[in-house]
């Protein structure tokens, strides 16, 4: 997300958010779900830009508490909500679903369940966006440090490892983008 005129990490992060918001093509009044909301950066930015109802989910009590407090502080608590819940237990249907930086934690043996869950939650003609750190070669040796300290139980997948479980759910890949330099 380092465009030619990007000078700081904050600018690069904003470029990433703007890029994702553009791809999501959120319309006023739509219901949006972020799977793995972290500290709320994406949700708060989307809420500032779009008139939609956004739910963020996480398994971290600290993240949810922080996000709820930050939403009140920003005056966005009527537009956004945060739930401490596993993606497999979420109810409802959404026009847009996105996940940024969470899929690495899912683990290969749960890919089918993950994409089935996204398909179940997505309204007809809805859009799901997945942003993940990946590897170029699915046969490459996993990085022991990353597997132990960064994504324990998870992995950085290759595109080929992601596409098969997506296709099995009936989701359709309409766009795939590799952003090598960021």
Go through each PLM region and give its residues.
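A short acidic, Gly/Pro-enriched loop at the edge of an enzyme's catalytic core
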Residues: 88-97
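Conserved Class I S-adenosyl-L-methionine-dependent methyltransferase catalytic core
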Residues: 1-23, 27
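Substrate-binding/catalytic lobe of Class I Rossmann-like enzymes that use SAM or dcSAM, i.e.
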Residues: 134-182
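Conserved SAM-binding loop of SAM-dependent methyltransferases across substrates and taxa
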Residues: 39-51
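Conserved class I S-adenosyl-L-methionine
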Residues: 29-36
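Conserved SAM-binding loop
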Residues: 67-68
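A short glycine-rich, Lys/Arg-flanked "PGG" loop and its adjoining helix->strand segment in the class I
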Residues: 112-124
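Conserved beta-strand signature within the Rossmann-like core of class I S-adenosyl-L-methionine
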Residues: 125-133
